[in-house]
A protein has these predicted regions:
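Short, acidic/turn-prone active-site loops that include or flank metal/cofactor-
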Residues: 114-115, 165-168, 195
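Active-site acidic carboxylates
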Residues: 18-114, 129, 159, 174-183, ...
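Distinct, well-ordered alpha-helical segments
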Residues: 93-100, 123-124, 149-151
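Short, Lys/Arg-enriched N-terminal segments with co-localized hydrophobic residues
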Residues: 6-20
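A contiguous pocket-lining binding segment that forms or flanks enzyme active sites
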Residues: 134-186
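Short phosphate-binding loop-to-helix
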Residues: 112-125
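Glycine-rich phosphate-binding loop signature in dinucleotide/nucleotide-binding domains
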Residues: 127-133
């Protein structure tokens, strides 16, 4: 009797496991309201040494870590990427920080004189050329080079997602005020971790899982997943 009861319990557990691990089919990216690798693109604006040095809304090492991590997410999920700098060709500014050049050096960089990237024709044509309506935007400063193109893109019918912990301003007040203004205009605020998880969404999508593991990294060096694995070895 006990063996029969154990067998029934085992069958129920197996059935429960199968039921709880049945993933839905991947949604149609054309109609999915969430970010997917097929319906979104990634924009990086003005992560140059002077701009990074002027950030006062968060620790600069954390900012650099977060923009590098967000960029790695875009590369992992093969998003179209548009990278822009300001005033490099005029000699008034330096190229993007080395950490981003290492990741994006194989892509075109659209250098501008306009403060608002959306008012640069080459930049705007590059963005529109990919034909995607969901724009994941990162830029320095939040209150200028992120806010201006984000507000313009919203006016032209795009959906804009600002990665709030991968951008920064000249003060906490400037950063937060710009985020409020953008949100009031319809910009959607997301975080670095949310970006990774929204693009991945299912551990069964194994091709991107190795890159997805970067979601557990932190700027202070702590990795929760690695710490958990190490604790299980003792």
């Amino acid at each position: 009797m006990r063996d029969a009861s154990n067998q029934r319990s085992s069958r129920r557990l197996t059935l429960f496991t199968r039921l709880t691990m049945a993933s839905e089919k991947i949604r149609n990216p054309a109609t999915d309201h969430l970010l997917t690798p097929e319906n979104s693109m990634f924009i990086v604006i003005d992560y140059q040494p002077v701009q990074v040095a002027s950030i006062r809304s968060m620790p600069r090492d954390e900012l650099v870590f977060n923009i590098v991590s967000a960029t790695k997410a875009a590369l992992n999920y093969k998003l179209p990427i548009v990278h822009s700098t300001v005033n490099v060709k005029t000699g008034l500014n330096r190229p993007a920080i080395n950490e981003l050049q290492e990741l994006l050096g194989h892509l075109p960089t659209y250098d501008r004189t306009t403060v608002n990237a959306w008012e640069d024709t080459e930049f705007k044509e590059a963005v529109k050329g990919f034909g995607r309506k969901k724009l994941i935007m990162t830029a320095l400063w939040t209150e200028v080079c992120l806010a201006f193109p984000a507000l313009d893109a919203i006016q032209e019918g795009f959906e804009v997602y600002a990665v709030v912990d991968a951008v920064g301003g000249t003060s906490v007040a400037a950063h937060e005020t710009a985020l409020r203004r953008m949100e009031q205009a319809g910009v959607k605020l997301i975080s670095r971790v949310q970006l990774y998880c929204e693009l991945q969404r299912d551990w069964a999508r194994k091709d991107t899982v190795p890159g997805f593991m970067n979601v557990f990294e932190n700027h202070d060096g702590f990795n929760a997943e690695k710490a958990f694995q190490e604790s299980n070895q003792h």
